[in-house]
Curated annotation (Swiss-Prot):
Any Pfam family matching the protein: DUF6736
Key words, A-Z: Glycoprotein, Signal
Keyword Ribonucleoprotein: no
GO cellular component annotations of the record: endoplasmic reticulum; mitochondrion
This protein's name: Putative uncharacterized protein YER076C
Glycoprotein recorded as keyword: yes
Sequence similarity: To yeast killer toxin KHR.
Positions bearing carbohydrate: 65, 86, 93, 220, 231
Signal peptide from the UniProt entry: 1-23
Length: 302
């Protein structure tokens, strides 16, 4: 199908939703097949304009009296409001599926996905079997920010309803973290994309198999990082352990140090559908997603 078909289908779906809900509409996704996902607001005249991630979530998280609920910044599943759970549910393809949740303050949030698989190098893959349905799996999403041992850490995470998660992080995962940190710290080259590694089917918590997918890059000609191997290892262990211990089963942690070095670490439970398309898991961009630091992590250090 051409991108024009997806665009027409997209706006046609929105038109139907407006006719039914007569509410302010916020949505996530791409405008058409092949375009990057984003956050959007649709006006009464059907015009769509981009909004920031913070504005998107704060708006749809408003209570009936227009205030952000106290629990809005809580990451734990037991405390997170149902609003966040509802609006982050993903449909497989907006030409076939569309989820609408009518919230208590008359704001409708639509979450869509173009069923686009992204390879490690950022290229788009569209295999025939990609038309999967994820709208029963994603339970909640959060964006968090903190600093550990001098390393800036941000994470974009999802809790999948069908995946199992425990609260024990064992040395098995730590050994793999140490491997890729040593590779990231000591590797160097003359290209901006510094490489990637995959550690599949790591069974570290006694209940669930897990996999790690990591890639690093630099805005300088060298891929070296000035942070010590020990500090980076501690930052990764603390952040991943904290996310796992809060029940996250598919998440990406972005690490940055200085003005040039970046790393993305995707951690995926084997029961999560994202395990089949790990490089499609969203990662926060260091310079763009400016959510305030909250309690998403255990105590930050450094």
């Amino acid at each position: 199908m051409t991108s024009g078909y997806y665009t027409v289908s997209f706006f046609y779906a929105i038109l139907l939703l407006c006719a039914c809900t007569r509410a302010e509409i916020y949505l996530t996704g791409g405008e058409s097949q092949g375009l990057p996902s984003g956050f959007w607001q649709m006006d009464d005249d059907l015009a769509i304009a981009p909004v920031s991630m913070v504005e998107f979530y704060q708006t749809i998280g408003l209570t009936a009296n227009g205030t952000v609920p106290e629990s809005f910044n809580k990451r734990d599943a037991t405390e997170y409001p149902n609003i966040i759970s509802n609006i982050t549910t993903q449909a497989a393809n907006f030409t076939q599926h569309s989820l609408v949740e009518q919230l208590q303050n008359d704001v409708t949030a639509i979450s869509i996905s173009n069923a686009i698989n992204v390879a490690v190098d950022g290229s788009v893959e569209t295999p025939a079997d990609l038309q999967y349905n994820r709208n029963q799996e994603t339970g909640e999403s959060t964006l968090c920010r903190a600093k550990f041992y001098g390393v800036e850490v941000r994470t974009w995470s999802r809790l999948y309803n069908r995946a199992v998660s425990s609260t024990t992080l064992t040395t098995n995962l730590n050994s793999y973290i140490a491997q890729w940190v040593a590779w990231a710290v000591h590797g160097s080259g003359d290209k901006k994309f510094c490489g990637s590694q995959e550690f599949t089917n790591i069974f570290f918590d006694g209940q669930e198999g897990w996999s790690l997918f990591v890639k690093t890059w630099s805005t300088n000609s060298s891929c070296d990082i000035t942070a010590s191997e020990g500090n980076l290892t501690c930052a990764v262990r603390v952040s991943v352990s904290s996310m796992h211990n809060h029940g996250k089963t598919a998440f990406c942690v972005t690490y940055s140090h200085g003005d040039s070095w970046r790393a993305e670490l995707r951690v995926v439970a084997n029961d999560a559908w994202s395990h089949y398309y790990p490089w499609s898991i969203d990662c926060p961009e260091v310079d763009k997603n400016n959510m305030a630091i909250n309690d998403c992590f255990d105590q930050a250090q450094g």
